[in-house]
Amino acid sequence: DLIDLHENLYPRPDLFPDALHPIKEGAAILAQTVYGNITKDFGGLKLAAVFTDNMVLQRQQPIQIYGTANGGDLVEVTFKQQKKSTITDRYGKWKITFPAQVHGGPYEVSIRSNQKNIVLKNILVGDIWFCSGQSNMAFQLQNSENGAAEVKKAIAQSTIRLFQGKAIRETDDTPWDSITLAKTNQLKFFSGSWSTCDSTSVKEFSAIAYYFGKNIAHEENVPVGLIQIAVGGSPIESWIDRYTLEHDDKVVDLLTNWRKSDFIMPWVRERAGVNLKNATNTK
């Protein structure tokens, strides 16, 4: 069988300075990929990052639970007294689909493999809204008009759940350190998990997203999950995946020497120059 070395390296052009030969980190990824395919050891049962305690699953749509496990493992998922199972593919990937559900909860989701069992608790079924944008979307509830009072009342919003993707660094006017630069190259821009709505979780959450979600929960009378991914000053091009950029004649040139490209707004290039001042990869 052929081993797919493309998938893990495609998002990392920084590992190929001459566009052909990988640096040490790239060679390590190649070796780990070969090892996993030969041994079927992909690190055991794991869920995609969006599946955690306190999450919301979309109502009235088929519900998909997915992740990775070791190659050939049996994975069983139990939800609302329904049990479904599948065998992971040769790369350790798995996905299980449950029928569409009406709103409700709280529920538990149990995921079991040959070696591990994961139980997700306090799950609701309702409507999920993706809240993305620049600094206007990132503007925190605690800093809004009457925000302090709203933060204190947030615990009453028991059917609102929050997933705040926290950026590894702000795009402020300072150079990033080596750890931030390494995580950026690894595409580890955000971290986060679902949380209930209370005075701690909501104070730094998007004010726009929170008030929107509060109104939706009241008007529709269903649980609401809000996913915040917002980066101040981010251009629209940064929200488009690499494959789409590469395969569109109108925007493909954005990927060529982008820090000096007229296709990128001058203020974006200027700030990128500051943030990436300590980068060893000049591209």
PLM-predicted stretches and their roles:
Residues 1, 7-10, 41-283:
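Cell-envelope and extracellular/periplasmic
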